[in-house]
Amino acid sequence: MPKANTAPPSGVERILRPEPLILRGSTLFEGDALTVLRRLPSGSVRCVVTSPPYWGLRDYGIEEQIGLEVTMPQFLHRLVAIFAEVKRVLTDDGTLWLNIGDGYTSGNRGYRAPDKKNPARAMDVRPDTPVGLKPKDLMGIPWRLAFALQDDGWYLRSDIVWNKPNAMPESVKDRPARSHEFLFMFTKSEKYFYDWQAAREPADGGGLRNRRSVWNVNTKPFAGAHFTTFPPELIRPCIHASTEPGDYVLDPFFGSGTVGLVCQDENRQYVGIELNPEYVTLAADRLQGQNSNVIRIAAA
């Protein structure tokens, strides 16, 4: 009687023991970011481009997901721990580009605009107003995280304003409608690789100039996702400035895999980490046919 086939699906490797992970080309890891990062080799990636989940916005029903912490300090503390491992994995001359969204306190009110496409994923109520803030305060999460990472040893080198010309309108009447987010540039060391010429932008009078700190980039929805994805044109200058062809680029919150797509376009290797199996499938489909490895990592 032939033996039953117990091998994992083609292209998928199941790793159950916490052994070191060796990078052999572009790879997508399904698992918790901190668990996977702790097993990656030190100094193995040249650049990190990522956008962590917002705090208290959506519940995807995934255990250990980022963004469901009870308090804002817990959320920030957890991200600082993750980026401490990111720093270890980064080369000494490497760079981190970090985008994270902000929000307003709400006094525990329900959301005004639920996720109509995926109502089960919308949080029923916003988190409680953080200690020290008032209802309707802008929480300042991007800068709180930036300063926390700076305190943890990162070099904060630049704050880029991501201006969204096609930003979704807000119904507010008591403040300006938001149309920007921040993209922070951090480095591991005082001296680092930065190819300013590769990241130049068009100058008003013609020619090219050193890229400025306000980037006008439209949001770009992806038909296969229920969320607005990281725009490729926000990612591309980061990769141009901080890597050379063949370098590894890490995104520990891989989502639908846009960082991976840009890496393929620019002849870079990507390392993606994503906890949500639905997103892993989505990203793998987008990267199909590009010799990407998908590895599932069991929880520690």
From Swiss-Prot:
Residues 112-127 have a biased composition (Basic and acidic residues). One of its GO terms (cellular component) is cytoplasm. Residues 109-129 are annotated as: Disordered. Pfam families: N6_N4_Mtase. Keywords: DNA-binding, Methyltransferase, Restriction system, S-adenosyl-L-methionine, Transferase. GO terms for biological process: DNA restriction-modification system; methylation. It catalyses: a 2'-deoxycytidine in DNA + S-adenosyl-L-methionine = an N(4)-methyl-2'-deoxycytidine in DNA + S-adenosyl-L-homocysteine + H(+). Its EC number is 2.1.1.113. It is an enzyme of class 2 (transferase). Belongs to the N(4)/N(6)-methyltransferase family. N(4) subfamily. This is Type II methyltransferase M.XycI. It comes from Xanthomonas campestris pv. cyanopsidis.
